[in-house]
Amino acid sequence: MSHPLPFHSLATLFHHGRAPRHQVAFSLNEHHDWSSFTCHVHSLCEQLKQTEAPRVALCAANSYQFAIGFFALCFSGKAIVLPGNYQPAALNELSCEFDLLLCDEEVGSHLRQAYQLISDTLSAGKPASFPHLLPEQVVLTLFTSGSSGTPKAIRKTLQQLDSEIAVLEQLFGQQLQDCRIESTVSHQHIYGLLFRVLWPLCAGRAFAQTNLEYPEQLVAHASDHTALISSPALLKRLTSEHHSSPFASVFSSGGPLSYEAAMHAQTLFSQTPWEVFGSTETGGIACRQQHQANTPWQLFPGIDVELNQENCLRLRSPHIDGENWYQTADECEMVSERQFLLKGRTDRVIKLEEKRISLVEVEKRLDHLDWINESVVIPMTESDRLTLVAAIVLTSAGTAKLNDLGKGKFWLMLRGELRQWLEPIAIPRRYRVVSEIPLNSQGKRLTNQIEQLFH
């Protein structure tokens, strides 16, 4: 094993630097070293200083181009805006949040609005010197849909990101020595931003420029010198048909990873995934490896928690502001001072005909049936009446039962089973069978696509 590279914070990384030939990013056909990276950042930074736009939205499909844009914006004194995705309509919806759109060629080719290409301003000049960044003065805005589905702006400082990256290196750095980073998640969100771009840069680990998108690619790119940054959206699509191949480490975040999916990943990759629990608002809160069902979550260092009257987690964290308590909607059970079990989201409680209904509980009851592998339950208004509908993924036994009974009798059977636990008002009135629940690359449910199943 080679001697580990020194770890540097985001604020001091460019001041300390790396060896000129140190590899920063790679793809199948090329790689970029520290010398070219710093020249590219300096070149774009000088161009950005000439613009009057104080708020710049950064969108890139290529993670190397994204990293160039990110640090060029830091050093040019711009406020950084990171849209959650770069679909034209989504960017138009956020247009009031930024004054200039900075993107790479792949993103730009799909846009109708004005933009500046990162690659148009890059040149390989002489090595540049960089000052220390003032981490509390570099501000970026990320977006989360939350429970409403409407993008919500979340402000972060470089200081808060540095605080979280230092914890990640403290917890996991030793097992990632000599590793390079492959990923299936977007850097436009906090998890991918930290795990696939900024943390690797601070630790001197090369990262892939593009995403892996299919289970077959995960197997093909696996090696015992590669760490995988992924999500339940892709990990649960792995099947026994995929050949086993080891990773040095596997991370998962963005949504719940079932115990079965965790065990299957262990079988395929010789690594039980490290699951990370947190949000855009809170940053990382806790982690776990599911060596058994209902493995509790272990709090990250530096985070204090308590439960409110509804048993929802309150936390105080340096990744937020370090002083004030932040209230979450995550119902928990503390099993020790630093460990807890997640019970579900209380903001997924709705009122139907004056009764409080937990959508999480309805899904849990569906998922416990032998015929259902996974479900999602959402409220919908039909004929001026609010009701519940469910999209379900069947097990092989469920598919056989549906074929045997037919849809009408199958739905009646489901409702009959649910009546053992749920009041009639809480039982979904309509169902759709799907091959998989619609999720984005972060493992978040695509509510709009689920709603379209019932139109």
Language-model-derived ranges and their functions:
Residues 45-86, 179, 183-187:
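Conserved AMP-binding/adenylate-forming
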Residues 331-425:
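AMP-binding/adenylate-forming catalytic core of the ANL superfamily
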Residues 33-34, 131, 139-166:
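Conserved AMP-binding A3 loop
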